[in-house]
């Protein structure tokens, strides 16, 4: 295999990981909504993070991480951002449709891509992603029905998502995939009290375990491990642009599971976002980012 082919393959590998992660997250979001009537968004977030932390600690063995005082601070911020991102996103799903919530949340990683851009070609990919998002977001009568508080929660989740990308990139560079386990444990400790206050003893209902475990695996354990591997193999800027696929998967999830039809304009939007993601990925192949072993 030539050097150029290896560079392209190296760039496409994290893209594949992110696609699997996003499919998993969308499936988990659908399952999570079934828990809202019982324990609310706060309790669902707590169950998700607690079960996910148990899984990731067992699989990734984070005690092997060599933490310094500086790297510990980064991991703590990463974990808090992760927890708040989960909580605010679920809060938004109580009143805002999945596709719209994801599109609003995406303002976070898009901001990372914009602020991190250095070459003119980067702005082309970001511009394409923005155009696609604007076309995907339902304006008209659908937008008039959007709950403003729910939209605010989604935008807040976007801010946390941006912090998750930036600090996850730094933390992952130091400790690899162990960072995912450490981050989820910190997130569970930070969000847990909120869930307990809101849901109380309902969190101890053993009948919720199968659904909660499914949400933990689909929405946290699997995708965040894959994302952490991807974050160690690409720049924060590239990750932010590639994350534009998230609202695309949300729209497709609505089509498959909720039978929501898409207009020609929305399909064109999906094409624009995918093209932007591919362009950003192939562009990163020439930058030769430093790879960090995933252990």
Positions of PLM-derived features:
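C-terminal-most transmembrane helix of multi-pass membrane proteins
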Residues: 2-3, 7, 49, 208, ...
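Juxtamembrane helix-entry segments on the extracytoplasmic side of multipass membrane proteins
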Residues: 9-15, 38-42, 46, 67-72, ...
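Transmembrane alpha-helices of multi-pass small-molecule transport proteins
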Residues: 14, 37-84, 111-112, 160-164, ...
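Hydrophobic/aromatic residues within transmembrane alpha-helices
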Residues: 35, 44, 48, 92, ...
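Specific alpha-helical transmembrane segments that line the substrate/conduction pathway
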Residues: 43-53, 82, 89-120, 157, ...
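Hydrophobic transmembrane alpha-helices of multi-pass small-molecule transport proteins
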Residues: 77, 107, 121-140, 157, ...
